[in-house]
Amino acid sequence: MNKSKDNSKGEVKRGAMVGRIIFEVVKFCITAFVITNIVNIILMGPLLPRFGRHAKGGKYFVSPTAQTVRTPSGSYFEFQQGGGCAGFSSAFVLRHSGVQIGGEEAFKDVPFQMKGGIAFPKGITGFFKKRGIKMSACSGNFSALQNELEKGRPVIVVIRSFVDKSYLHFATVTGYDEEKVYLADSIQSWVNVDKDGNAIEPALDTAPTSGESVYYNRTIPLEEFKKLWNTSMLKMPLYRNMFYVMK
């Protein structure tokens, strides 16, 4: 009888210990999650949620406007030497609005930089704030991105450099259709569309043209883009599907 009671007490103690361990693990995970996101907000800036139900059409391409400024070489595009994608993508958006500025010049004015030409996401909003332009960093779904494009402005996004890598890259989206996303990218080795919209290596098909020259130099298959756009990782779990909205 006493032996049975002792066994019962032992089981209760073990059960309580297991429960305590589970509680401590859950508490640690929640605390780590909260602290991680507080640090992310401080370092990278807050994100505004922005979601859309659907886009207006199956495809849309931003076109150069009357005030769009080309680079000194006569092209819409310029390429970075090393880092600086935050400045080059920001310069592309400004040139679309009629402001003559190059990527290197812009990057010098991007705040919150690290070594190697890398900038925190809040550097984009800080750059435009210096120019009196309200730019909000957002996180949402692809429909929200489509709806922003349909306002006729290129949209800066944050994507992975490669699907299986954690390196982040700023690029400018200028269009989409049912199969691909179209970008103005400042890394020359990723360019896969020529000035007439014809696909070049490593692309396998032909992109549609838009006037005398296209307003994009890179296409990414839609499903691959969504994987690249998902930048969530252990150190930044909530920072995914990031794009910038100009007011």
Name each model-derived stretch.
Residues 81, 86-90, 120-127, 141-145, ...:
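Stable alpha-helical elements in mature extracytoplasmic
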Residues 21-23, 114, 150, 154, ...:
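Noncatalytic regulatory segments and standalone regulatory/sensor domains
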Residues 134-192:
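Active-site-adjacent substructure of cysteine-protease-like catalytic cores
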